[in-house]
Amino acid sequence: STLTGHLIYKCGGIDQRTIDEYEKRATEMGKGSFKYAWVLDQLKDERERGITINIALWKFETKKYIVTIIDAPGHRDFIKNMITGTSQADVAILVVAAGQGEFEAGISKDGQTREHATLANTLGIKTMIICVNKMDDGQVKYSKERYDEIKGEMMKQLKNIGWKKAEEFDYIPTSGWTGDNIMEKSDKMPWYEGPCLIDAIDGLKAPKRPTDKPLRLPIQDVYKISGVGTVPAGRVETGELAPGMKVVFAPTSQVSEVKSVEMHHEELKKAGPGDNVGFNVRGLAVKDLKKGYVVGDVTNDPPVGCKSFTAQVIVMNHPKKIQPGYTPVIDCHTAHIACQFQLFLQKLDKRTLKPEMENPPDAGRGDCIIVKMVPQKPLCCETFNDYAPLGPFAVR
């Protein structure tokens, strides 16, 4: 959060007076070093614990892009929120701490860094920037050796997880606190020849937007705004959303008309893929809508709930073998729903994805299986081929 907050501040997303106010209040609480993090950690509870719980959305502009930052939690208790944030992103910035012991803990068997990188890959993110952060740490002292060690280890770990292009990613030595290598190259690390963070962001290619497909918008939150009414919010994944449209909220059959669409407090004539929007609907109360519902156009391939679906599942890490009947919570787009693994149909070779065994009795770490899955509550998901953002899911 400190790195992200500093980036937003430097790009003019927040003024100096607010930063000064945050610094004063953070110092009073004995947390002066958290002032930039406070840009994002708006919740009082988060400030007092010094960790990120919710997903903060913030907008800033670079020379090339308007960027929406989704600051997702890195703390284990809040992994569900982290998954929701990741499922809305085009690219990821993975922040690893350079401090002795801190980096090693993150990439250990159950470490956060490894888990986040795995989830980002599973949820369909293709491109990543890695910030080797806290280079100003008293033990690290902007050391090239420490940076090289972390870069080498991260490349190896990312490849093992399934990031085939890990060698092409930018690995940037940064300090969220001092601002080194955020907006411009740092004179404290003359040995580093790559881009600073803002240039790396501008060097990313914007993904192709599926505007030609029917509308799909998974709901992230639902608000009641006085004088306006019920406002669901989320990211348009495919298609377009515009005032006057009749939309359905799957897996229910509730239909409503869109009155207005807003992004970052500006009204839009229409929103397309990648836009994080809030929209006002007629005739529905906040209690009628839930996070995880999917919005679609009533007249154009509207989304529906599914009673069961067939999925390819890779067991990344599980203490013991799983068998049919196993019922974990799955995170699919913004939905979090218990889902039973009813039948194991096939076991596949992980490299070729060719069937190795029909109806395997169980599956363990490293296995790739085809499973018939039954949601325990209504769920709207789609095949990866038809609507790629609504196909991937993570099992926890």
Swiss-Prot record:
Residues at which GTP binds: D71, A72, P73, G74, H75, N133, K134, M135, D136
Main subcellular location of this protein, as a coarse class: cytoplasm
Entry coiled-coil feature ranges: none
Domain tr-type G intervals: 1-211
Keywords of the record: Cytoplasm, Elongation factor, GTP-binding, Nucleotide-binding, Protein biosynthesis
Signal peptide extent: none
Any single GO CC term annotated in Swiss-Prot or TrEMBL for this entry: cytoplasm
InterPro entries tied to this protein: EFTu-like_2 (IPR004161), G_TR_CS (IPR031157), GTP-eEF1A_C (IPR054696), P-loop_NTPase (IPR027417), T_Tr_GTP-bd_dom (IPR000795), TRAFAC_GTPase_members (IPR050100), Transl_B-barrel_sf (IPR009000), Transl_elong_EF1A/Init_IF2_C (IPR009001)
PANTHER family, alphabetized: TRANSLATION FACTOR (PTHR23115)
Cited function: This protein promotes the GTP-dependent binding of aminoacyl-tRNA to the A-site of ribosomes during protein biosynthesis.
Name of the featured protein: Elongation factor 1-alpha
Species this protein is from: Giardia intestinalis (Giardia lamblia)
Organismal lineage: Eukaryota, Metamonada, Diplomonadida, Hexamitidae, Giardiinae
